Amino acid sequence: MSRLQTRFDQLKEQNRAALVTFVTAGDPGYDTSLAILKGLPAAGADVIELGMPFTDPMADGPAIQLANIRALEAKQNLLKTLQMVREFRKGNNDTPLVLMGYFNPIHKYGVPKFIADAKEAGVDGLIVVDMPPEHNGELCDPAQAAGIDFIRLTTPTTDDVRLPTVLNGSSGFVYYVSVAGVTGAGAATLEHVEEAVARLRRHTDLPISIGFGIRTPEQAAAIARLADGVVVGSALIDHIANAKNDQQAIDGVLGLCAALSEGVRNASV
């Protein structure tokens, strides 16, 4: 059984959602990024998404775009990102770790070599935002054959006709991205999420995680009552962007992670 399935199964038994945290590898530099990565599980992260820096992250908002720039300026590349995973695994063999990004760096690295190296490093899953299911044979199928989950993104515009195609070959969990980020989890917004989760559950038995512009423990708790996972990225990355030094970046990210985790754990599912 994969680390992802094990973790979601454990949390289901505890009747709570997973806190899924996203940070960009190498932001603001390798050592600080690794310290953040190593600290996330103890701060309450149940699943970690680690961004693979890319020069043209077209599907990401301003905060993550800037994180990519900072990481690339610090000379982060895919080789170093996999090394970071290896370093993380030396002290943590339980927390699922998913690489998220775009196909171009993987293509340049070489798909067979990437899959072999990712598996050896301890990567559990991939989210590759510009690889539609029509191209499953290029990356999704060989990754899954090696035991690496391939996680699909769905959005409010993914209709019932398209959903089965998108979910075909998906594993690990489904990542639902609400394209309209929120500043406060209002009732209408939560109603929209509840409807989206119900619609997805008609099409898949996989856990459903929501990425939602979540910034506060209260928002995290509200989403945790509706879904299997709560994804937080930009709010964590903002602490790196606004930090005056590396230690402040580490403390800011891990402090917010702990607060979000408390919100998720206190939510009654």
Curated annotation (Swiss-Prot):
Active site per database record: 49, 60
Matching CDD domains: Tryptophan_synthase_alpha
E.C. code: 4.2.1.20
Enzyme class (EC, first level): lyase
Catalytic activity: (1S,2R)-1-C-(indol-3-yl)glycerol 3-phosphate + L-serine = D-glyceraldehyde 3-phosphate + L-tryptophan + H2O
Coiled-coil annotated spans: none
Molecular function as annotated in GO: tryptophan synthase activity
Cellular component annotations (GO), alphabetically ordered: cytosol
Domain of life the protein comes from: Bacteria
One Pfam family this sequence matches: Trp_syntA
Entry keyword set: Amino-acid biosynthesis, Aromatic amino acid biosynthesis, Lyase, Tryptophan biosynthesis
InterPro entries per the UniProt record, alphabetical: Aldolase_TIM, RibuloseP-bd_barrel, Trp_synthase_alpha_AS, Trp_synthase_suA
Pathway assigned to this chain's UniProt record: Amino-acid biosynthesis; L-tryptophan biosynthesis; L-tryptophan from chorismate: step 5/5
Chain's role: The alpha subunit is responsible for the aldol cleavage of indoleglycerol phosphate to indole and glyceraldehyde 3-phosphate.
Summary of subunit composition and partner proteins: Tetramer of two alpha and two beta chains.
PANTHER family, per database record: TRYPTOPHAN SYNTHASE ALPHA CHAIN, CHLOROPLASTIC, TRYPTOPHAN SYNTHASE, ALPHA CHAIN
Family: Belongs to the TrpA family.
Entry protein name: Tryptophan synthase alpha chain
Species name: Pseudomonas syringae pv. syringae
Name of the gene this protein is made from: trpA
